[in-house]
């Protein structure tokens, strides 16, 4: 009797409850000799042609708030990155790379996949985030190796990411100012170890000889960079 009751209950469930969550696709990444970083093709190119609207983006961003928070601040422990103030071009590229399987992010894919978010909504969200003020209370490191970390940053990172961590929208180099220390350290290690499959090969060369201590030190320095004109009030 119990077996029949269970079978009936299963039949009465909505189809959505029985559906298998869509799996993130896999495309060629940096592990492939055919990999081209930031190729001018695919969904990224399509989205960048669209005109984003911040008001619509505010509404569409509601689906992101559970992890990245209404302020775009993410989580200080680095579980989820800080997005507020990020270049729209960078947001578009990273979402497109996730949707097309060049950046492995199984946690994000169910919320950002093509089955959930349209290209226009991505363009809108990207503009909305770019216009947000960068929070100042991001997660920071211990501050014990900042002099050495500054030397590393100036030598290896500043030419692309800027003196104040402002990045470069036209070149798709992300804003680092206000980003969480633990997130930055993890991403540097992943790029070094080949786990960040959509990494810029130039950056792989820069960090290939970094020790974990180097990665953590420079991440600590990056997390303290500040862009006063784009930062939230204290």
Predicted regions and their residues:
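Electrostatic cytochrome c docking/interface patches
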Residues: 24-61, 76, 130-152
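Axial heme c-ligation environment in periplasmic c-type cytochrome domains
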Residues: 20-26, 76-82, 98-123, 129-132, ...
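Gly/Gly-Pro-rich "capping" loops immediately C-terminal to redox-active cysteine motifs
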Residues: 54, 69, 73-100, 113, ...
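Extracytoplasmic/secreted proteins, especially bacterial periplasmic and envelope-associated proteins
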Residues: 52, 56-59, 90, 107, ...
């Amino acid at each position: 009797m119990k077996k029949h009751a269970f079978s009936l209950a299963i039949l009465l469930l909505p189809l959505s409850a029985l559906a298998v969550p869509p799996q993130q696709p896999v495309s060629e990444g940096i592990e492939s000799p055919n990999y081209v970083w930031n190729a001018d093709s695919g969904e990224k190119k399509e989205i960048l042609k669209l005109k984003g609207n911040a008001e619509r983006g505010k509404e569409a961003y509601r689906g992101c708030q559970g992890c990245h928070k209404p302020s775009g601040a993410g989580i200080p422990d680095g579980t989820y990155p800080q997005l507020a103030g990020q270049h729209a071009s960078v947001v578009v590229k990273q979402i497109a790379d996730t949707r097309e399987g060049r950046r492995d992010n199984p946690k994000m894919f169910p919320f950002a996949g093509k089955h959930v978010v349209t290209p226009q909504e991505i363009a809108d969200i990207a503009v909305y985030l770019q216009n947000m003020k960068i929070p100042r209370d991001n997660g920071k490191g211990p501050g014990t190796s900042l002099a050495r970390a500054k030397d590393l940053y100036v030598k290896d990172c500043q030419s692309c990411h800027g003196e104040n961590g402002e990045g470069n929208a036209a070149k798709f180099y992300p804003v680092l100012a206000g980003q969480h220390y633990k997130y930055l350290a993890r991403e540097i290690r992943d790029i070094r170890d080949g786990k960040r499959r959509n990494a810029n090969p130039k950056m792989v060369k820069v960090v290939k000889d970094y020790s974990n201590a180097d990665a953590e030190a420079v991440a600590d320095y990056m997390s303290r960079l500040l862009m006063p004109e784009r930062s939230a009030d204290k």
